[in-house]
Swiss-Prot record:
It comes from Desulfitobacterium hafniense (strain Y51). GO terms for biological process: co-translational protein modification; translation. This is Peptide deformylase. Its cofactor is Fe(2+). Keywords: Hydrolase, Iron, Metal-binding, Protein biosynthesis. The gene is def. Gene3D superfamilies: Peptide deformylase.
Amino acid sequence: MAIYQIVEIGSEVLREKAVPVKEITPNIEKLLDNMLDTLYDANGVGLAAPQVGVSKRVVVIDVGEGPIELINPVIIAKEGEDLDDEGCLSIPGITGQVARAAKVKVEALNRQGELQVIEGEGLLARCLQHEIDHLEGILFVDKAKKTQRR
């Protein structure tokens, strides 16, 4: 296992649309493992592959209920609205209020290549949307109503 360096705002890869994963190879499995190690090392709740310099549609999340691994995630349903503060491992020291859907349903592949549906609300819904935005080259500061130093 390895801890990746988290790339910060200003890095080109954070503004690119990430490439879909065509095949789940041992390298993708290793990426998932190392991303989870990196997430836990950084005390984060979510991490997208572009944040570690890899332009792939891969996300890992753990909001305290165990790890969730998502390959090629797509939001298929949204409900309600929630305004709350967000931060980002790629934008240290900054928080901002961002409006997000209160509930989401996401389809993605797991590391076995099986299609899974994840339903989330609260922090999980916010984290799913935030990380999927990373795959589109969108950062939370692009959507924030206001930002502040923490």
